[in-house]
């Protein structure tokens, strides 16, 4: 089992390193699915589905949904929902700023709830989507500048004697990255054009995000922790995909759903508040010749795991967690509860996931926020507003959430992969007498 943890987390680290943002998450997972025999569907074309077929569809190049059809008379849907975006700096248009005729820095803005100080004094680069005018047609091309390209330098303590007493960082004035000397003006545009195989004049628009170039790795005396950028939520993405690829579909349709823009509220066409999941489930139903009544019945026999990482007890701040429900790295998948419904877990869905975990021999931990702290939000309750199915919020316990370099447990990646595999193989049936059966 230790070897399995080691191998799996080596793959996780490689996935983190080649996935700087949501566009590359979709690209990389598409490649894995295609290699495994999945057929790509288009939202702007009719779907032709068959029993035993394996399919995937994407939206905006930054959200993806994959599924397998076990049989035409399937019972329901087993939906694993996660998100592929992470807090980062986004590059503004007209980004170059020349300082004192000596430096070139870049104008950026915050995406999501960032820990700003963690972005200082690290090698950074830029990746994302570039829209190019090629013979009158707009083409989207993905770009990842795989070099140590820029850095946001700290102000020396000699010029800021109060630095260790707490400094408030301003995103507009303190956090603009230095990319080169004044002699390199317009250099980024030229670099992007070269990467896209076009001229600088052919670049029409961009969606580019900064990312930390430090490779993901394992740390600890026994290498028991994994550290890297974007563990929230790519650890759940990776583990869920492993379970999805390994599972054999049972009586329900296994659905792997990876959404975008969770870190900024999910209110986009590719986010949890949109109809991407709902549209796909309805189209599966229609393509197999089932009617609206069949669809509603299948929803009643469905279950969703909303997978988004959770807060581990911090060794230097143990008072920040709940008094009786504490979560730690390497001690199992976290099940989240919230009285104000920020998390979707209720007694029914919580009991179902406990039965599922017991069957898969996967340990669970329970998470509540402190009663005097609001905590963060996630995508589960937003998704179920569009698709009303039983849902449970889960995740993996991590430290340094929303840092440029995060930390979690190596065992937990395997625990979630095993739970996801069992989940995708299972089916949930709700009887007329109000009882539930996990098949």
Give the location of each predicted region.
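N-terminal hydrophobic/helix-forming segments and targeting peptides
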Residues: 1-439
